[in-house]
């Protein structure tokens, strides 16, 4: 797994910027994606993938320790759909 610090270092090296600038850029990217998803917009990066906000329906879940069935409220979550460019890059 790559950590945020490792990602910042990689961005800084590839973009030829210092780590503080890379950290600011990464945090701005994360904030922009989050804001778009909160407002109901998908974030599509052609060749890489699409971030989507989806609503999970309410339902029931089971407590694994007690076996008790509990109601789970509807909630929103984020999904990432891999783009063809990234998929083919991973499989080459």
Swiss-Prot record:
GO MF entries: DNA binding; structural constituent of chromatin
GO CC terms, sorted: cytosol
Listed Gene3D superfamilies: IHF-like DNA-binding proteins
UniProt record, GO biological process: chromosome condensation
UniProt keyword annotation of Mitochondrion present: no
Matches recorded under SUPFAM superfamilies: IHF-like DNA-binding proteins
Matching InterPro entries: Hist_DNA-bd, IHF-like_DNA-bd_dom_sf
Annotated stretches, region: Disordered: 58-92
Pfam families per UniProt: Bac_DNA_binding
Keywords: DNA condensation, DNA-binding
SUBUNIT field: Homodimer.
Family to which this protein belongs: Belongs to the bacterial histone-like protein family.
Purpose: Histone-like DNA-binding protein which is capable of wrapping DNA to stabilize it, and thus to prevent its denaturation under extreme environmental conditions.
Protein name per UniProt: DNA-binding protein HU
């Amino acid at each position: 797994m790559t950590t945020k610090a490792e990602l910042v270092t990689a961005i800084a090296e590839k973009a030829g910027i210092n780590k503080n600038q890379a950290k600011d850029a990464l945090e701005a990217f994360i904030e922009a994606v989050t804001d778009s998803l909160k407002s109901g917009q998908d974030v599509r990066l052609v060749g890489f993938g699409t971030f989507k906000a989806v609503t999970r329906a309410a339902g029931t879940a089971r407590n694994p320790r007690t076996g008790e069935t509990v109601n789970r409220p509807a909630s929103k979550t984020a999904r990432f759909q891999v783009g063809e460019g990234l998929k083919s890059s991973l499989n080459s």
